[in-house]
Amino acid sequence: MTIEQQIVATAIAAVKELYGQDVPEKMVQLQKTRSEFEGNLTLVVFPFLKISHKKPEDTAQDLGQYIKANSQAIADYNVVKGFLNLVIDKKAWLGLLNEMNANEKFGEKPVTENSPLVMIEYSSPNTNKPLHLGHVRNNLLGWSLAQIMEANGNKVVKTNIVNDRGIHICKSMLAWLKYGNGETPETSGKKGDHLIGDYYVAFDKHYREEVKTLKAQYMAEGMDEEAAEKKAKEESPLIKEAHEMLVKWEQNDPEVRALWKKMNDWVYAGFDETYKALGVGFDKIYYESNTYLVGKKKVEEGLAKGLFFRKDDNSVWADLTDEGLDQKLLLRSDGTSVYMTQDIGTAEMRFNDFPIDKMIYVVGNEQNYHFQVLSILLDRLGFKWGKELVHFSYGMVELPNGKMKSREGTVVDADDLIAAMIGDAKQTSEELGKFKDMTEEERNEIARIVGLGALKYFILKVDARKNMLFNPEESIDFNGNTGPFIQYTYARIRSILRKAQAEGIAVPAQLGENMPLNEKEIELIQKLNEFGAAVEQAGKDYSPSGIANYCYELTKAFNQFYHDYSILGADTEDEKIVRLVLAQNVGKTLKNGMALLGIEVPERM
């Protein structure tokens, strides 16, 4: 039982004993005591006034006397207006530190056989181009959210839906047939996703040229500019061929399907490299080429049950006007599906594969309305988690102007960004002398850890709902609210512990109850103890930024302590041992906290 749990239980017993009434746990509000007052935790008395029928100060005195007399964790108390400030006994702090020291995952809840199953969808790439900066934010948020939900005692399934069909894929395929001369990732020396992305760009280039030529021709024939452009886009031989290829794909044409599979396989190999470099992955991958058929079938079942309706043109719709929304198209008049149909199909396949209790979609905020509708439709179709599905909505991420422009000058490839971050981390680390006495292999590994840590932390520390500007230079600063600052602090702690070991100092598993503790050491234990609450809150709010903020606050607290107090040069052996145990647990908590963000920490720097 934690110190907070002990106090809550004793406070509930106090109200029962003193005022003869049972109160729920949520009525007992504990908060950290403000720095200008004596104490460690403060009990808010106001919720009990209707029960005590006394003044706030008198109620606080009653509760304070009872809690001090009945809880070994409390050394003393004082009352400030309606607030009861509790001074935690030094032995209780040492006991808490021992508890932390004995638990490698202190602050996290274990996953059990009966834990609820949470499925998290993220990434959702198209197979006609490489992953870009927007995908980076999506993948980092999804991966971190999965770690946080697991740390809150949930079983987690990480999933990806790949948009592997449609006109955009056919454009890349057609361009490769026309202009590729049999080029492959091996012959070109390019990753498969980059190669296919180049052919998507090539299609667009040739298509624009065709439209320009046709538009000029139609205008010369007397057509106005707007009508000429519209007709040119429709009559372009390239776009017609792409649509013909899509029809053949849907008809299972063997040649088209073989080409589609070959080119998609190149892309998947490229994606896998990017995911590996980014340190993310999935437990189950779904493909739109499978799910859209399931979605069509599910919509037709809903139609037969009267959940949806068919219009005169044969299209199928859902009427959501009773929910304050509009009518939603589910199948076009020619029977082809829309994105909503595919999402219904994907949901059906997942529901059949896993006993899902909660479904979280990590998708940009431009899709807010889509998921509002999907939630209603899934609920009507009988998915138990439909009504409660979570759309983890996030904002756009951009780079400062002139930073890392891509070949098209608009979108930054994830691979280019990762390589640039690792390169910048290596250069900055060399300039700051962080690579002293390291081999080239060790330098490259530290650069990888720091570069990716800088990228991930800078993105994840921002509230996901907000648009953000990612500044590569700011992210690699070894001071301030950055990944490298936290990583360097962890490496410093590991260095201290190695020096202690070299001096023959053994860090004990348990501290005796009479070991010395000063106020600053108690503050550090209290900050360590807040990790569990930070993990729980991050799980409730779906907020990786809450974990990032906690790691930064703990890092600042340790660095201030280390500035004020020597660890290995402490005045007494007992002080040295206590501080080494403290440092060890700060390091462990930083490592665990950063792992929830998908960030590695280096053992040395």
Segments from the language model and where they lie:
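Non-catalytic interaction-recognition regions
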Residues: M1-L94, T112-M605
